[in-house]
UniProtKB/Swiss-Prot annotation:
GO molecular function: ATP binding; microtubule binding; microtubule motor activity
Protein's name in the database: Kinesin-like protein KIF2B
Record field: compositional bias (Basic and acidic residues): 585-604
Lineage: Eukaryota, Metazoa, Chordata, Craniata, Vertebrata
Keywords of this entry: ATP-binding, Cell cycle, Cell division, Centromere, Chromosome, Coiled coil, Cytoplasm, Cytoskeleton, Kinetochore, Microtubule, Mitosis, Motor protein, Nucleotide-binding, Phosphoprotein
Cellular component per GO, a single term: spindle
PTM remark: Phosphorylation at Thr-125 by PLK1 is required for activity in the correction of kinetochore-microtubules attachment errors, while phosphorylation at Ser-204 also by PLK1 is required for the kinetochore localization and activity in prometaphase.
Species whose genome carries this gene: Mus musculus (Mouse)
Residue ranges of coiled coil: 149-177, 646-667
Length: 668
């Protein structure tokens, strides 16, 4: 064990005093205090002194292992100031002993004061046993300088801690905001960032809409299992009770992604958490009482196939079975029978009848009579009648649900690229009120077939393509009828489709009320179809705003452009042809006395006007689902070739006329 021989405490070193002069105080074998990299201070034996480079080598034993290191002289003097001067050793002050108890690790003695170097009786390596070190009563406080190695270690440690903090922040942000396994990671991040900046309002603050003839609502469904498996993104945001936003992902020329946010405004917008009861409260429920006042109400669901139309109208699906008790069919029936029992309408002695039929391929079939084919005719009073349609009297909600289940079991369905059980027909369920055998009011609930793009059915069978064409044709006709209803036009083009023909009484008259529920899919893969649905519904909403100018709404950017394309193509074509025919005689009249060649232009014009009937003939041939499309295409190409020849002849004669006019102007 080392002896308790103490060296006197030296005064504070002057920075100008050369360090090499202090090597006279050092000798191999003395015991000095050193500081480890983990801030521990303990004793070690000097084994080597390098006077040229000003460093010493020390050794010590720790846990039975002999260790050593090189230390700068300045660092040793900071911890052992007694070695600074021999003269101060002679005049040292009395010291008081302090006992330091070693820790579990040998050589691990910690103290807040400075250590005083000691010289042992013999040259032995400190083993870390219990030692009593003499510390001055008034210790000299000196600033210890860290070695370059220690400073570099501390610098690296700070950088490491900073990197770890940044990584933890990034991981926490990713865990809260986005799923890093999503292939559309960047798009999801931009959508979430945009949503955080929006001020959303709760659906509970909704109030029932005021009475009006047209009501347009939008309902968003949640992501289904297939979309979740494909890691599809939800690109639909409903920030308030009447605003729908679509975040369309696009790509710049430099391949960077960005969002194009399109905003639509409607009477009401329902998010994916809204129930059928909530949707019914603000859509069909305000129209129920109108049929007791001799009104004709219509509520139809429109949207892409697989967007939730049948779920909204009929109820939720449990596998392949449908729970019809929570659909709009059942909710309307409940309110109808409740109003029948009120004193105001009980005295009318009204009876309720139910009908259920579908429109498939331009033909009408009775779903309550084994899909019997029906005829749609007009009677002497110009009222549309569905000949042979079976009407069954109902007295409670259960009987209505039985009719709905029977009709749904017979309804035409098929498989598409989006939905394995897609409805391929328009289903119309009607609740009719009669008083004394005469019609009193009628509520038509229409579950429309899903609208489809031609690009989606390009690889489908011919039958499926013809179905989609007929569906889109009837939906366009329905839009034109709603336009006429919103503008209070005297003429309604209901004859353009069987759907609008059977619903004629819902579009004509002051007691007609219409409610549209546009269902949309939230997935990014359905973005194009969703935008088409919202544009269709927004057009209906714009028409409703013309009838109710006091209601303000935010229209989507660029919505004026589709209105310019809304004109009928046939009428536009006819007006263009008429202008071309008129321009030629006008030029003839002006230049009749100057050139005799212009008289021959009347022949192409007459040929053009005689062929104006070609499109009508082709339409008659292609009318209906069973039309021969190949024959119509061949006939159209033949007529177009003839017209191209006529136009080429006119072009040559106009060029000749221009040349003659130029020559005449040069002569003058």
């Amino acid at each position: 064990m080392a002896s308790q021989f103490c060296l006197p405490l030296a005064p504070r070193l002057s920075p100008l005093k050369p360090l090499k002069s202090h090597f006279t105080d050092f000798q191999v074998g003395i015991c000095v205090a050193i500081q480890r990299s983990d801030k521990r201070i303990h004793l070690a034996v000097v084994t080597e002194i390098n006077r040229e480079n000003s460093w010493v080598t020390v050794e010590w034993v720790e846990k039975g292992v002999k260790k050593g290191k090189k230390i700068e002289l300045e660092t040793v003097l900071l911890l052992n100031p007694a070695l600074a001067s021999l003269e101060h050793q002679r005049s040292r002050r009395p010291l008081r002993p302090v006992s330091v108890v070693p820790s579990t690790a040998i050589g691990d003695q910690r103290t807040a004061t400075k250590w005083i170097a000691m010289i042992p009786h013999r040259n032995e390596t400190p083993s870390g046993d219990s030692q009593t070190l003499m510390i001055p009563s008034n210790p000299c406080l000196m600033k210890r300088k860290k070695s370059p190695c220690l400073r570099e270690i501390e610098k690296l440690q700070k950088q490491r801690e900073k990197r770890r903090r940044l990584q933890l922040e990034i991981r926490a942000r990713r865990a809260l905001d986005i799923n890093t396994g999503n292939p559309n990671f960047e798009t999801m991040r931009m959508i979430e960032e945009y949503r955080r900046r929006l001020d959303s309002s709760k659906m509970s603050s909704l109030e029932p809409p005021e009475d009006h003839r047209i009501c347009v609502c939008v309902r968003k469904r949640p992501l289904n299992q297939r979309e979740t498996t494909m890691k599809d993104l939800d690109i639909i945001t409903i920030p308030s009770h009447n605003v729908v936003m679509v975040h369309e992902s696009k790509q710049k020329v430099d391949l960077t992604r960005y969002l194009e946010n399109q905003t639509f405004c409607f009477d009401h917008a329902f998010d994916d958490k809204a129930s059928n009861e909530l949707v019914y409260q603000f859509t069909a429920r305000p129209l129920v009482e109108s049929i007791f006042r001799k009104g004709m109400a219509t509520c139809f669901a429109y949207g892409q196939t697989g967007s939730g139309k049948t779920h909204t109208m009929g109820g939720a699906f449990l596998g392949k079975a449908q729970d019809c008790s929570k659909g709009i069919y059942a909710l309307v029936a409940q309110d109808v029978f409740l109003l029948l029992k009120t004193p105001a309408y009980e005295k009318l002695e009204l009876k309720v009848y139910g009908t259920f039929f579908e429109i498939y391929g331009g033909k009408v079939y009775d779903l309550l009579n084994w899909k019997k084919k029906l005829q749609v005719l007009e009677d002497g009073n110009q009222q549309v009648q569905v000949v042979g349609l079976q009407e069954q009297e109902v007295s409670c909600v259960e009987e209505v649900l039985n009719l709905v289940e029977l009709g749904n079991s017979c309804r035409t369905s098929g498989q598409t690229s989006v939905n394995a059980h897609s409805s391929r027909s328009h289903a119309v369920f009607q609740l009719i009120l009669k008083a004394g055998g005469k019609l009193h009011g009628k509520f038509s609930l229409v579950d429309l077939a899903g609208n489809e793009r031609g690009a989606d059915t390009a690889k489908a069978t011919r039958k499926r393509q013809l179905e989609g064409a007929e569906i889109n044709k009837s939906l366009l006709a329905l839009k034109e009828c709603i336009r006429a209803l919103g503008k209070n036009k005297s003429h309604t083009p209901f004859r353009a489709s069987k759907l609008t023909q059977v619903l004629r009484d819902s579009f004509i008259g002051q007691n007609s009320y219409t409610c549209m529920i546009a269902t949309i899919s939230p997935g990014m893969t359905s973005c194009e179809n969703t935008l088409n649905t919202l544009r269709y519904a927004n057009r209906v909403k714009e028409l409703a705003l013309e009838a109710r100018p006091y209601h303000h709404c935010v229209s989507p950017p660029g919505h004026e452009v589709p209105l310019m394309i809304e004109n009928d193509n046939t009428n536009s074509g006819k007006s263009l042809q008429r202008d071309e025919v008129i321009q030629i005689p006008t030029v003839e009249k002006e230049e009749e006395k100057e050139s005799d060649e212009l008289t021959s232009k009347k022949e192409p014009a007459a040929s053009w006007s005689r062929s104006n009937q070609w499109w009508e003939a082709i339409q008659e041939t292609a009318e209906g689902v069973n039309g021969d499309v190949d024959f119509c295409i061949a006939q159209s190409l033949s007529v177009l070739e003839q017209k191209i020849g006529v136009l080429t002849d006119i072009q040559k004669k106009l060029q000749s006329l221009r040349e003659d006019l130029q020559k005449k102007s040069q002569v003058e």
